[in-house]
UniProtKB/Swiss-Prot annotation:
Site (Involved in opening and closing mechanism of the pentameric structure): H22
Regulation acting on activity, per entry: Channel activity is inhibited by copper. Also inhibited by small-molecule pyronin B.
GO terms (BP aspect): monoatomic ion transmembrane transport; symbiont-mediated activation of host apoptosis
Gene from which the chain derives: SH
Keyword Acetylation part of the UniProt annotation: no
Glycosylation sites: N52
GO cellular-component term (any): virion membrane
Listed name of the protein: Small hydrophobic protein
Principal location listed in the UniProt entry: virion
Similarity comment: family membership: Belongs to the orthopneumovirus small hydrophobic protein family.
Topology Intravirion: residue spans: 1-20
Coiled-coil regions, chain positions: none
Length: 65
C-alpha cells in the first residue's frame, strides 16, 4: 500500500510539467502542419499562375498567326 502513495505523489508532482510539455508539443506540431499546408498552397498557386501565363502565351500566339 505504501508504494501507491509514492506513485500518486510522483504523478501529482510532475503532472503540471507533463501537461505543459504536451501543450507545447501540440502547438509545435500544429504550427508545423500549418506551415507545410501554407507552403503547399503557395506552390499550387504559383503553378496555377504559371499555367495561366503559358495558356495566355499560347492564345496570343494563335491570335498573332
Amino acid at each position: 500500500m505504501g508504494n501507491t502513495s509514492i506513485t500518486i505523489e510522483f504523478t501529482s508532482k510532475f503532472w503540471p510539467y507533463f501537461t505543459l510539455i504536451h501543450m507545447i508539443l501540440t502547438l509545435i506540431s500544429l504550427l508545423i502542419i500549418i506551415t507545410i499546408m501554407i507552403a503547399i498552397l503557395n506552390k499550387l498557386s504559383e503553378h496555377k499562375t504559371f499555367c495561366n501565363n503559358t495558356l495566355e502565351l499560347g492564345q496570343m500566339h494563335q491570335i498573332n498567326t
